[in-house]
């Protein structure tokens, strides 16, 4: 894998993507993180000052960008992943490609690939510590090289595990690309970004509270739509369900009851399946139901991207 993509290769890629755009539906571009996940199975999440032994250690491919791209691909979308890895990132690319993700935009940098230390307790709840690595090495030049291959009608999915998000928002919006933002992990600086450029927000209850200074789901949705009236909002509440809201409609979908084994990829699975259901023409209410079902399947399995179901596993009784 080369650290720099040649100009001729970029032209060839752009031409190939233009042909695909003409023959397929919406193209999804995920600009995000690629991590190696080190997953420690524990009786409980470690407390400050406590030392405990893990029951098991697993290594998996992850990162919010990787997981959302995997979820979209497993749902049947045409998805491109842009991100940065180190010389140790080969396994991430191989795994993503096996899922059906186009990784031609991923480049290599002189640093370690990002990783995450994930604690998973006996109830399937998790706690995550991130190391950014190459995920924090995005430049304006790389951002331009990625976005130059996309145009109006394409959909961009962003999270907050990479740097350069402000630049990406501005440049993607100028190209007419529809922007989806999952502001996770949340940082106060997010509120200073030009978030009016976002078409669809995916937030959980904690992120929603941080974004709006509200605590109740109804109040969070009201405030988000007041602040960003041209956007739609999906608010996930874990085992309590999820809301969809825009300025014309609002729907709630209860979560499906399952025995949670690992919740690591729950949110990313929900995001990917909601977007693909939307692409297939389902109503917002149906998209919530489809995403909830996919997320329920994912949390009933160990691992992150490997736990994401394929579309055929869902029961379409809507």
PLM feature segments, named:
Residues 70, 115-119, 127, 241-244:
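Short beta-strand scaffold segments in enzyme catalytic cores
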Residues 2-28, 188, 217-318:
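Conserved phosphate-binding/catalytic region of the ribokinase-like
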Residues 33, 83-87, 108, 120-122, ...:
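Cofactor-binding loop segments of dinucleotide-utilizing enzymes, especially the Rossmann-like FAD-
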Residues 45-54, 202-204, 252-253:
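Short glycine/proline- and charge-enriched loop/turn segments
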Residues 155-219, 223, 241-242:
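Conserved beta-alpha-beta core of the PfkB/ribokinase-like small-molecule kinase fold
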Residues 48-115, 317-318:
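Substrate-binding N-lobe of the ribokinase-like
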Residues 106-108, 118-155:
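Conserved phosphate-binding/catalytic loop of the ribokinase/pfkB sugar-kinase fold
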